[in-house]
Amino acid sequence: GGAALRALAGGAQAQDYDLTIAVLPSPHTAYLKMAETIPDRIAEATGGKVKITLNDSLVGGPQIAAAVRDGRVPMSSALHTYLAAEEPRMGIFNLPGLIDNMPEYAYVCEAFWCEDVDAIWLERWNAISLANGAWCTQQLFSKEPIRTVEDFRNKKLRVHNPQTAALMDALGAKPVPLALSEVMPALERGIIDGLFTSTCYGHGQEYWRLAPNVQNWGLGPINGWAILINKEAWEEMPEELREQVQAEMDRFEGEAIYGYYDFVREAMLDMESKGVTFWVAPDSEKARIFDPQYTQPVYDSWYKRAEEVGFDGKAYIEKVRQTLGKDLLR
């Protein structure tokens, strides 16, 4: 018996680090499909010394970063957008017309933004960011078509960040903050007329059954996520293990970024096979929605929050625009 117990204890020692990663329940999304690869990848990269278990019922979305900060969970796949009110740099991709697609997101990330955000994760959330990715292209799922600027008027739309809320206000819509678990009943009961969400998330939740109009207005099309680990949990690992984990998470990030459109395509093709029609706003209508009378209030509220947090918002946005060459458009 003693030998068997010692063998068990030995096995436990070989399995040096046992970590749980909190994720949002989100079937069919790039976010979850990528996260599901982490346990096997890290076990292989560390020779089984780091064991990671996925859990989708530990923490709600808005708490998913704070839970890591407070040590309630050692790891999570966190969403920047939920923190955009608190820290505006987490919400740059929600500003209309700033970051229009995945290549632009990846470019700005690589240029300076991800490094800036890594420092914020560490300072404000006591977390090390191991990798970045993004949700599939944001779409507007609605019961009735919303295909002109006028169509937004009085529509009750669920939004997930303050920038989109400010834009909806300017357009005469009624932005509604709503927990994800309440979206389906709210659609059923007419509490909301539609919502902005990722293509893949909307596909997995089957929102198209109640909101069959799926429209791409190009409003904050890319929404990021980050794989976080609590600073103390990270520092408990010996350096060699940390290097193995980080090298694997660098590969993971490459797949999340460069394989991004494969996830979007898969979701769109599956929805189309179920009768969903996708609509993309023509440039003429996008030009109307991106008119400064609607977009300026969004930027102004962002600049105001930047000032409260203690950085120069206008200079920050100009840096993004210059990085992407958007200041050169004549």
Specify the residue positions occupied by each region the protein language model found:
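Sec/Tat signal peptide C-region and signal peptidase I cleavage site
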Residues: 6-14
